[in-house]
A protein has these predicted regions:
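Bacterial N-terminal signal peptides that target proteins for export
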Residues: 1-9
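Short beta-strand edge/turn micro-motifs at domain boundaries
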Residues: 142-155
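Solvent-exposed, flexible loop/coil residues
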Residues: 70, 75, 112, 120, ...
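Surface-exposed, charged secondary-structure patches
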Residues: 102-143
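Bacterial N-terminal signal peptides
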Residues: 8-18
């Protein structure tokens, strides 16, 4: 559980979620809550699904929730990104997707009464929205999770 918590913190803190289509239809909190609901569903069915099943379950959630192209640009650095070929860009985005899916499938591998709670939604710089949430563990401990959602095409 401790390894799962560390990964959750890193993933939630570092990744940007939301897509332009979702942002137009849902509030930032609703986008985050949909991600959390999917994670809980996967956790509750983790044993029956197995790793491969969890991967198949979470893959469309990851691609819908996370702006992987924007994350790739930020991870590589904008200066480096501009030097990549189209094939290299696609390869990096695919690698980020594979890593995200595998991480969620490996770390959310069971359910012990965990739940997510949205604490606040606040406007941030450049039209972004900051959503603060927490994961409550089965033992009652809480872990803060932070999300930054971008609007429009960057989103």
């Amino acid at each position: 559980m401790q390894r799962r918590i560390l990964i959750v913190i890193l993933v939630a803190f570092c990744l940007i979620i939301g897509s332009a289509a979702q942002a137009a239809e849902k509030s930032a909190s609703e986008v985050v809550n949909a991600l959390h609901a999917s994670l809980l569903e996967m956790m509750k069915d983790a044993d029956a699904l197995g790793f491969d099943g969890r991967s198949k379950f979470i893959e469309p959630v990851v691609t819908k929730s996370f702006n992987l192209p924007l994350i790739a640009v930020m991870a590589a650095g904008e200066k480096n990104w501009k030097t990549f070929s189209k094939a290299q860009k696609k390869q990096l985005i695919a690698a980020l997707e594979d890593l995200s899916v595998a991480t969620y499938a490996a770390r959310f591998d069971g359910y012990s009464g965990e739940n997510f709670r949205t604490l606040s939604e606040q406007p941030a710089d450049q039209g972004t929205t900051y959503v603060s949430t927490e994961l409550t563990q089965g033992d009652g401990g809480t872990i803060p999770l932070k999300y930054l959602l971008y609007p429009g095409d960057s989103g």
